[in-house]
Amino acid sequence: MIVMSLTNEQIIEAIASKSVSEIVELISAMEEKFGVSAAAVAAAAPAAGAAAAEEKTEFDVVLKAAGANKVAVIKAVRGATGLGLKEAKDLVESAPANLKEGVSKEEAESLKKELEAAGAEVEIK
C-alpha cells in the first residue's frame, strides 16, 4: 500500500472543488471517523470572538442633575416617561436617577437632547 502525503493546500483545493452535498457527506464521515461534532466547534468559535467585538445596542438614560429650571425638567421627564407629576418630581429631585433603561441608541440620544434643552444634565450609559 502506497501512502501519499497531501499538503493542507491540496486538501483545501480538493474540498473547494466539491459540491455542497459532497462537503456535507465529507463532514458527516469525518464526524463519525473522529467522534466529534462540527456543529459544536462552529458554534463555540464565533461566540468567543463576537463577544469582544459586540457593539452595545441597549443604553440607559441617567438624569445626573435637574439644573436651574427644575419645572421644565419635570415636564420633560413626564413627557418622556409617562410618569405622573408627583412621580416625575420625585425622580428629578432624587437625581442621579435612571430615567429609561435598555433603550435604543437613537431613543437615548433623542431623550438626552430633549432633557438637556430643558436644562437637565443627562448621561447615556
UniProtKB/Swiss-Prot annotation:
Pfam families: Ribosomal_L12, Ribosomal_L12_N. Keywords: Ribonucleoprotein, Ribosomal protein. The gene is rplL. GO terms for molecular function: mRNA binding; structural constituent of ribosome. Signal peptide: none annotated. This is Large ribosomal subunit protein bL12. GO terms for cellular component: cytosolic large ribosomal subunit. NCBIfam families: L12. It comes from Mannheimia succiniciproducens (strain KCTC 0769BP / MBEL55E). GO terms for biological process: translation.
